[in-house]
Swiss-Prot record:
InterPro entries (alphabetical): Adenyl_kin_sub, Adenylat/UMP-CMP_kin, Adenylat_kinase_CS, P-loop_NTPase
Region annotation NMP: where it falls in the sequence: 30-59
Protein's recorded name: Adenylate kinase
Entry EC no(s): 2.7.4.3
Major subcellular location class: cytoplasm
Location within or outside the cell: Cytoplasm
Record keywords: ATP-binding, Cytoplasm, Kinase, Nucleotide biosynthesis, Nucleotide-binding, Transferase
Keyword field contains Hydrolase: no
Associated pathway: Purine metabolism; AMP biosynthesis via salvage pathway; AMP from ADP: step 1/1
Entry text on domains: Consists of three domains, a large central CORE domain and two small peripheral domains, NMPbind and LID, which undergo movements during catalysis. The LID domain closes over the site of phosphoryl transfer upon ATP binding. Assembling and dissambling the active center during each catalytic cycle provides an effective means to prevent ATP hydrolysis.
Length: 189
């Protein structure tokens, strides 16, 4: 099964990605993991990405896209994968379509973890308190939500129009959210 997981910061994407990938016996593919693997492996793409990160700049889409393309072509991703953190915008979604077409496969489903804004703020504020992260104040969190809405709303609409979107209520105990996601995935299998 080929799955994309989207949702606002604090929706539980990392947690659900780990659990769902394990339950489905497919690799969790996250851009963070891919960046770390390429940088620590000293790949050509890793060196290019590192130069941007060292300057505090965002890694351009073409480098991110190339890293994702390479990762999805690996043997363990042939039977399926769960993408976490990619695509983040419409351009990346269109590139993902091209990548998958080149590999001769299609996306099965896009899971959107749905959490209202106040719950996101509560979760991230709590996470900041526990992790002692002073940068995650309410103003910063609200800004991250604005950026998410601007970039990801068109992405959600793009997948909804294609009949790939499953909205998952991501409020409640982790196990319940996982169960809702698994039910949605089984309906697509």
């Amino acid at each position: 099964m080929r799955v994309v997981l989207v949702g606002p910061p604090g929706a539980g994407k990392g947690t659900q990605a780990q659990i769902l990938a394990s339950k489905l016996s497919i690799p969790k593919v996250s851009t963070g993991d891919i960046f770390r693997a390429n940088v620590s492996g000293g790949t050509e793409l890793g060196k290019k990405a590192q130069a941007y990160m060292d300057r505090g700049d965002l890694v351009p889409d073409e480098i991110t896209n190339a890293m994702v393309r390479d990762r999805l072509a690996e043997d363990d991703a042939r039977a399926g994968f769960l993408l976490d953190g990619f695509p983040r915008n419409l351009a990346q979604a269109e590139t993902l379509d091209e990548m998958l077409a080149d590999l001769g496969v299609k996306l099965d489903v896009v899971l959107e973890l749905v959490v209202d804004e106040e719950e996101v703020i509560r979760r991230l504020a709590e996470r900041a308190r526990i992790d002692n992260r002073s940068d995650d104040n309410e103003e910063t969190i609200r800004h991250r939500l604005v950026v998410y809405r601007e970039q990801t709303a068109p992405l959600v609409s793009f997948y909804e129009k294609r009949g790939l979107l499953e909205k998952i209520d991501a409020v409640g105990p982790i196990e319940e959210v996982t169960q809702r996601a698994m039910t949605a995935l089984k309906s697509r299998a």
